[in-house]
């Protein structure tokens, strides 16, 4: 008998993932699994009803290509009308000509696979295409077997209507073929918005026939012709993906300054900006010619981009040039404008009216939000849930990007927890204040992070910078007498783990895999505890979804896929699937399959780019056998280490004077995946052992022995000059393995006191904050050591 798995309940989703052998991502809203399998031969009969001719031809070609890649042999699709089909697709709202996807379009579908074939029903062609994506993920095959599909019934629709990816084509230019490949992946992940970042300080990447100097003077010849833009938009629409352009204003405008300096608040000759960061050039918002420029630019761009939303950026405005400009000073007096924020709002109000003239809705980052603007603007939040909630409470729509910045290496489990509408924990603010601490976390670049910790009864809350207080988890109950403890929370920086040591008024914080020092100070006048209030049901409806972002300071076309895939599927699932899906272990199991599927079937290049990148570092003077062995060695090392998380690599580059457009991004670390499966498994084993599973110690030892065996040829790396850094890392991994043997001896009670005294410091000494490559295995082994040391002391 088939059994039903309905993902509306609180308890069932975890069991659903565990029980279901379906490697789907995102997971559907409802699944009913049967007990049989449908097999199809090398000719698949297909009937398609409701697709326009262009979309039908496009999708048939894709399905045939993907089926062949799955099967590993030729598969012929034969379109049938009157006879029985193996695969039937029916759309209720039939398409007569190519439909352009828009916000709020129906994306639901139902899918049934049984002995009679595959039946896909959808309200729109866009929902039908999501159903096709599910069919492809369900299919299995090889050259010696027929295509197979498990008997399954699915009823599916997205949780959020805005599910996007921002691609930054400015800081490093991305060719059209690269953009199209990401669209292929987005369609497979059921994402529906490409947010195309086309202008910034470092360049103007889209052809303007009205203002030709923009690309002539400020693109280095790297820009998209209008014909190419139309090609991308059509390709995206055939995949059910909207294309929302971003034209940054009034800041991030150095490229405009190079081409048209008279439009700037400070009129002078400008050179191309090559560095990364926030810069001062701003449009002169008191100059009428600026609004003529914007109006004419909008008229040209809306003729290219059919979507109803247009993004103006609006972030990181440094007002110095405005406040120094006499025309703007006079305007401030005339309109009673007090500061840079008032000036930006004055500009935004005028620009919003221009955008509305072209039947478009203005969109921008947090900084555009102001109650004087019409309610139909859309705010994209990089500042976090507190900012997004403020927007929604004021009656404005918003989407979340904080926590989805995939240009920053972060763990997929962190992205998976990052819900645009998180459930609010119960916090009792009437509990007595037990303790308050202030702490400071210095960063490698920029101002330090200032924080406060407060203990209210049994609750522990942390406040970071100007954000609201947030409930955190601790490793033990905290009292006034507690001198050492650990606290964990998620933040805009990533997952945080604090180690507080009140005995020495210092500690450390892990931001992802990067360990920063912190100092503790007493606090006589702590900030009032202020937590985020719950949103009303009406406010909930204003949170439209979210967007992942791939800013390209540290990314080129040669490693873009390594950074995006496969983890974008995790964010896609968070935006599509039920909120109750929170089992990260089950997610990682499916992600392994999806990584292979997206490489082998969809054609994403995360595996290819890594292999090519590693190959490029191997000396050409080596013989073929040595080159093969070196590549294998690099592949093994890549499974053990990670790039430093958060913005740590960016800040290291800044310290090295390599934080600019000319700096090469072709080292080993540039081709590393963002997280190590083997280290995650090691961490799980340590967690099991600490929880009482003594058998896990044997598996930990086997894992370490496996690493040691794989690194026995580490000396090969010395023969390739580009791998000097990797050789040093490999030697440190071997040191870790040696120290880990002492940790295991400590856990077995066989380590002498003389050997254990400095083991904690020795483990930590293997890693420096200024290392771009992180030997992440240090930290679970340190956790194991501290646990065993504590047990032995007692």
Q: Residue spans of the language-model regions?
A:
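Feature activates predominantly on carbohydrate-active enzymes
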Residues: 98-311, 325, 350, 354, ...
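Substrate-binding groove of N-acetylhexosamine-processing glycoside hydrolases
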Residues: 24-26, 32-34, 40-42, 82, ...
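Contiguous, structured surface segment used for ligand recognition
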Residues: 19-160, 571-584, 589-602
């Amino acid at each position: 008998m088939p059994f039903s798995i309905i993902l509306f309940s609180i308890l069932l989703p975890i069991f659903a993932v565990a029980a279901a052998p379906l490697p789907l991502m995102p997971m559907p809203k409802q699944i009913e699994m049967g007990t049989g399998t449908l097999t199809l031969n090398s000719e698949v009969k297909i009937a398609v009803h409701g697709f326009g001719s262009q979309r039908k031809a496009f999708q048939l070609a894709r399905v045939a290509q993907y089926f062949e890649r799955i099967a590993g042999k030729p598969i012929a699709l034969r379109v049938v009308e009157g006879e029985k089909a193996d695969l039937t697709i029916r759309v209720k709202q039939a398409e007569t000509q190519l439909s352009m996807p828009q916000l709020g379009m129906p994306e639901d579908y139902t899918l049934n696979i049984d002995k009679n074939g595959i039946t896909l029903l959808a309200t729109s062609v866009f929902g039908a295409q999501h159903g096709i994506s599910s069919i492809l993920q369900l299919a299995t095959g090889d050259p010696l077997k027929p295509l197979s599909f498990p008997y399954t019934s699915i009823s599916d629709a997205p949780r959020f209507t805005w599910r996007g990816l921002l691609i930054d084509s400015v800081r490093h230019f991305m060719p059209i073929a690269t953009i199209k490949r990401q669209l292929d992946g987005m369609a497979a992940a059921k994402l529906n918005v490409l947010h195309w970042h086309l202008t910034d300080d470092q360049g103007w990447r889209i052809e303007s026939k009205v203002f030709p100097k923009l690309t002539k003077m400020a693109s280095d010849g790297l820009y998209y012709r209008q014909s190419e833009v139309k090609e991308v938009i059509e390709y995206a629409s055939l995949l059910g993906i909207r294309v929302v352009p971003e034209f940054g204003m009034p800041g991030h405008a150095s490229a405009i300054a190079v081409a048209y300096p008279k439009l700037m608040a400070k009129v002078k000759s400008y050179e191309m900006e090559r560095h990364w960061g926030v810069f001062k050039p701003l449009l002169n918002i008191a100059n009428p010619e600026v609004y003529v420029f914007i109006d004419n630019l909008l008229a040209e761009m809306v003729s290219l981009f059919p979507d109803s939303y247009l993004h103006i950026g609006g972030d990181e405005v440094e007002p110095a040039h405005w406040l120094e400009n006499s025309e703007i000073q006079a305007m401030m007096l005339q309109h009673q404008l007090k500061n840079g924020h008032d000036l930006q709002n004055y500009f935004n109000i005028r620009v919003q009216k221009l955008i509305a003239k072209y039947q478009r809705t203005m969109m921008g980052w947090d900084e555009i939000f102001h109650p004087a603007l019409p309610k139909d603007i859309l705010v994209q939040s990089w500042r976090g849930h507190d900012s997004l909630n403020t927007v929604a409470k004021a009656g404005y729509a918003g989407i979340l990007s904080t926590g989805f910045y995939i240009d920053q290496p972060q763990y997929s489990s962190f992205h998976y927890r990052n819900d645009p509408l998180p459930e609010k924990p119960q916090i009792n603010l009437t509990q007595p204040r037990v303790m308050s601490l202030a702490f400071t976390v210095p960063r490698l670049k920029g101002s330090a992070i200032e924080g406060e910790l407060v203990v209210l009864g049994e609750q522990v809350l942390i406040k970071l910078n100007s954000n609201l207080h947030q409930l955190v988890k601790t490793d033990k109950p905290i009292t006034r007498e507690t001198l050492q403890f650990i606290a964990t929370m998620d933040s805009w920086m990533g997952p945080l783990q604090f180690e507080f040591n009140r005995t020495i008024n210092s500690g450390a914080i892990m931001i992802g895999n990067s360990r920063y020092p912190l100092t503790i100070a007493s606090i006589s006048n702590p900030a009032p505890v202020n937590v985020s209030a719950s949103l009303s049901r009406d406010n909930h409806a204003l949170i439209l979804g979210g967007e992942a972002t791939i800013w390209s300071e540290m990314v080129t076309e040669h490693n873009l896929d390594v950074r995006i895939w496969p983890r974008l599927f995790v964010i896609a699932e968070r935006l599509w699937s039920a909120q109750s899906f929170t089992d990260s272990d089950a997610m990682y199991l499916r992600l392994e399959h999806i990584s292979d599927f997206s490489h082998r079937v969809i054609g994403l290049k995360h595996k290819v780019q890594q292999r090519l990148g590693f190959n490029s570092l191997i000396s050409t003077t080596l013989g073929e056998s040595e080159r093969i062995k070196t590549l294998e060695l690099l592949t093994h090392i890549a499974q053990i280490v990670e790039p430093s998380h958060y913005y740590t690599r960016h800040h290291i580059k800044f310290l090295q004077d390599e934080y600019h457009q000319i700096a090469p991004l072709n080292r080993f670390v540039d081709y590393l995946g963002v997280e190590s499966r083997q280290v995650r498994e090691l961490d799980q084993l340590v967690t099991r052992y600490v929880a009482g599973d003594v058998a896990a110690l044997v598996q930990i030892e086997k894992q370490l022995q496996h690493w040691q065996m794989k690194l026995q040829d580490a000396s090969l790396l010395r023969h390739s000059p580009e791998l000097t850094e990797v050789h040093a890392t490999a030697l440190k991994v071997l040191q870790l393995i040696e120290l880990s043997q002492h940790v295991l001896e400590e856990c077995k009670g066989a380590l002498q006191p003389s050997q254990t005294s400095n083991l904690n410091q020795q483990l930590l000494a293997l890693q420096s904050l200024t290392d771009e490559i992180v030997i992440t295995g240090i930290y679970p082994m340190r956790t194991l050591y501290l646990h065993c040391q504590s047990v032995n002391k007692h």
